[in-house]
Amino acid sequence: MLSIDTNILLHAFNEDSPSHQAAYAWITSIQRDEDVAISEFILAEFYGLLRNPAVLKNPLSAEEAVEVVQTYRNHPRWRLIGFPTESRPLHDALWKKATAKTFAFRKLYDTRSALTMIAQGVTEFATVNVKDFEGVGFRKVRSPL
C-alpha cells in the first residue's frame, strides 16, 4: 500500500510551486488506485501549511483548509488511517529510535507518522524528502516528482 507525504499534497495544491504540475499530475494519476492510504497526521500537517502565510502567498481560512483536507479524508477509494488500535508498541519503537545519538529532534514527528503508517500496512511512501524516510521501515521510499 502507498501513502503520500505532506510535501506532495502541498505542491499539488499550490499553483505557485515550481513542482505544482508534476505533483498535480501524479496525484491525478493515482486517483483510481485502491491501494492508497492517507494519514490523518499528514493531513493535520497539510492543514497547517495551507493556513500558513509563510508557506502560501494566499493562505486559506480555517474553513477553506478543512474543505481541502476533507476531499482527501473522503476519497472514495483511499483508506484513511490514524493511530492503530494498539499504539504502545509503535511508540516503544519510536522512543527506541529517538535514543540514537544521530536522531535529530525534528525527525520525531515524521518517524511517528511513518511507524503509524507501517503498522497499518503501508509499504511504500511518496515524498520529496526521500532521505528523511529511508531506513524507517518502508519497503520503498520514492519521489514521484
Outline where the language-model segments fall.
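Histidine- and aromatic-rich ligand-binding microenvironments
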Residues: D5, R106-K107, N129, L145
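Aromatic- and histidine-enriched alpha-helix N-cap/loop-to-helix transition segments
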Residues: I38-A44, L108
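Short, basic/aromatic-enriched C-terminal tail that caps enzymatic domains
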Residues: E134-L145
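Active-site-proximal, substrate-binding regions of enzyme catalytic domains
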Residues: L50-E86, H91-L94
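Active-site neighborhoods of divalent-metal-dependent phosphate/nucleic-acid chemistry enzymes
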Residues: D33, R77-V128
